[in-house]
Design a protein with these regions (language model features):
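Domain-level signal for soluble alpha/beta catalytic cores
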Residues: 1-185
């Protein structure tokens, strides 16, 4: 309850700042997110949020894991990653709380962001764990797309003016580690 109140207060500050700057399409500031996609692990049934140390224990290939983290400048164990442990619930709302706060603050036009299906699938796939529920990363990806399509439909119904699909490290993933079975970023 205290966290929720603080989240709402700080989000309202972000909204006020944007309005004061003359920004016409407002964003929440994503203050409820550890990073651009880890919040999925807190919301979606079938997904758990794991620390990099927990991931390292599950993979068994510590050297490749360490290298992949160094390549992505994430070796300080400050990042959490959503990992799929069972079939995911594709009907859950991802950005419901963000939208409620935006609506409650009388914002006329607002934007919402979602992680890209490719990076979300790639992050959630851990062969040693996810392979027990999905036959392939592609099969998991199909459910991730269903999840995102469901959220997009709901966002449109709620009047979201812009929906941004984030893939901030996509080029690095594609060009540096495209053949990896597991990735942690």
């Amino acid at each position: 309850e205290v966290y929720l109140q603080k989240y709402i207060e700080e989000t309202n500050k972000v909204i006020s700042f944007q309005k004061d700057c003359g920004i016409e399409v407002i964003v929440s500031g994503e203050l409820n997110r550890d990073n651009y996609m880890s919040y999925i692990g807190e919301i979606v049934d079938g997904v758990k949020l794991l620390t990099l140390e927990e991931l390292k224990e599950l993979t068994g290939n510590n050297e490749n894991f360490r290298k992949s983290l160094e390549e992505m400048d994430a070796s300080d164990n400050s990042m959490n990653s959503p990992i799929c442990f069972e079939k995911i619930n594709t009907e859950v709302r991802l950005n419901k709380k963000e939208i409620e706060v935006l609506k409650d603050s009388s914002v006329e036009h607002y934007k919402c962001t979602l992680p890209s299906p490719y990076l979300l699938t790639r992050s959630m796939w851990l062969k040693e764990i996810t392979g027990n529920s999905y036959d392939s990363r592609n099969e998991l990806g199909e459910d991730v797309v269903k999840l995102l399509r469901h959220e997009i439909r709901e966002l449109v119904k709620e009047g979201v003016k812009i929906i941004q699909i984030d893939g901030p490290i996509l080029s690095e993933v594609v060009f540096t580690n495209s053949k990896s079975d597991n990735s942690f970023y």
